[in-house]
Regions:
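Donor nucleotide-sugar binding/catalytic pocket of nucleotide-sugar-dependent glycosyltransferases
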Residues: 49-52, 69-70, 148, 165-210, ...
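A conserved nucleotide-sugar
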Residues: 116, 225-228, 234-279, 286-287, ...
């Protein structure tokens, strides 16, 4: 759904989106929320270009009516900085600071050149740090207005590094519009900037499937979906599994990859869990929907990690709720924006395997309660996280910026 009045005002406007992530194919999940937002806004008549980093020398191309300009910033083998979490890679391997520096410098030059040639009407900057550094020359010298979208990570960096906070305090007031993916992220912005911030959550990027019932003799499935890094708290879910297995046979399905994958597999071996855990890696959207449809409980055990980073929103919970699945999660970051405790899911303390196990066992022992949470979650997602609502919010932000 689009607003006809706002559609008229966006007709023919060229919006250039600067993002570290964008799917390489329509079926890709890496940056799927950026792609889905753009596709949903195309009926407004606006033209979109995406400026995103190359992944191992990937070329620029046009996909679904959107030109994706892939900028080169390093040798092919090192062009994977933004895959699986740049902050974690920088923390674990300081030498990654070299491609990170080149990313900003070469990205700035190429973005300015692209803006000089294309003259967009608006720059939509995802993650204002570091992308605000890259967008600023084009915005200031060419007079292009900006909308800035914060996702949480850049603001948690600001808490840790004074120079990031100083930059954002100076940079945020330059924008014609600022958005946050959750009230948690909005709160972090408000510590640096006292102007208006529009909360616009992510919407569903996969098509929900009907529930797939268990086959005779099949044990209940617990599902986790996400990047395998510290802030996702998967190690605590693995520690909870022996407690669950002592009372109930289950199978854990883990979708996603990340820098901690080998450590987590080693933890599985130490706990003797190899036979009941499946590491599925990256999957297609069709396969992901299949996993949601066939699971009994979805668990997101996120934590505030050692860097102070945590969950900005948690789109995977929205996907699980869209499949009417009961969710067990932790009350960190933007998760409470999605889960209403004891109505659409269960929230337990972070870093607490016993609490995770207790919540999962409660749902498996009470299928009627689990089904009720799933139904409530589906209804809530259809209301608060519908694309109709989300796109109207984006239209208002963009129209105000280009007016």
């Amino acid at each position: 759904m689009v607003n006809d009045l706002e559609t008229t005002k966006l007709q023919g406007k060229h919006i250039l989106v600067l993002s570290s992530v964008y799917p390489l194919t329509p079926d890709g999940n890496h940056g799927a929320f950026v792609r889905e937002t753009i596709l949903r806004l195309q009926p407004t008549g606006a033209k979109f270009t995406v400026f995103a980093p190359a992944y191992e020398a990937s070329k620029s191309y046009t996909l679904e009516g959107v030109h994706i300009y892939r900028f080169r910033y390093c040798l092919k083998r090192f062009e994977n900085l933004v895959r699986d979490g740049a902050p974690t890679k920088l923390q674990r391997q300081p030498l990654n600071l070299i491609p990170a520096t080149l990313y900003v410098i070469l990205g700035t030059v190429q973005l300015f050149w692209l803006c000089l040639r294309k003259r967009p009407d608006l720059l939509h900057v995802q993650w204002p740090f570091p992308h605000g550094v890259m967008a600023m020359p084009a915005a200031k010298l060419l007079g292009i207005p900006m909308v800035l979208s914060c996702h949480g990570g850049e603001l948690l960096l600001a808490k840790k590094f004074g120079f990031v906070a100083s930059f954002l305090r100076w940079f945020l007031p330059m924008a014609k519009g600022i958005t946050a993916n959750s009230s948690f992220t909005q709160g972090l912005i408000n510590k640096l900037y006292d102007g208006p911030v529009e909360v616009i959550p992510y919407g569903l990027t996969i098509e929900a499937k009907p529930a797939i019932p268990r086959q005779e003799g099949e044990v209940p499935k617990i599902l986790f979906v996400g990047r395998l890094d510290e802030r996702k708290g998967v190690r605590y879910l693995l520690e909870a599994l022996p407690i669950i297995l002592a009372k109930q046979p289950v199978r854990l399905r883990i979708v996603g990859k990340g820098i901690l994958e080998e450590e987590l597999k080693a933890q599985c071996q130490e706990l003797g869990l190899e036979s009941v855990i499946d590491f599925l890696g990256f999957v297609t959207k069709e396969e992901l929907a299949q996993e949601y449809a066939s699971c009994d409980v979805f668990v997101l055990p996120s934590i505030v990690d050692s860097k102070g980073d945590t969950e900005g929103l948690g789109i995977v919970m929205i996907e699980a709720l869209a499949h009417a699945k009961p969710v067990v999660a932790t009350p960190v970051g933007g998760i409470p924006d999605v889960i209403i405790p004891d109505q659409t899911g269960l929230l337990v303390p972070e870093k607490n395997p016993n609490a995770l196990a207790k919540a999962v066992l409660e749902l498996l022992a009470n299928p009627e309660r689990a089904a009720e949470l799933g139904r409530n979650g589906l209804s809530d997602v259809q209301s608060r996280f519908s694309w109709e609502r989300i796109i109207l919010l984006w239209q208002k932000v963009f129209v105000k910026a280009v007016d």
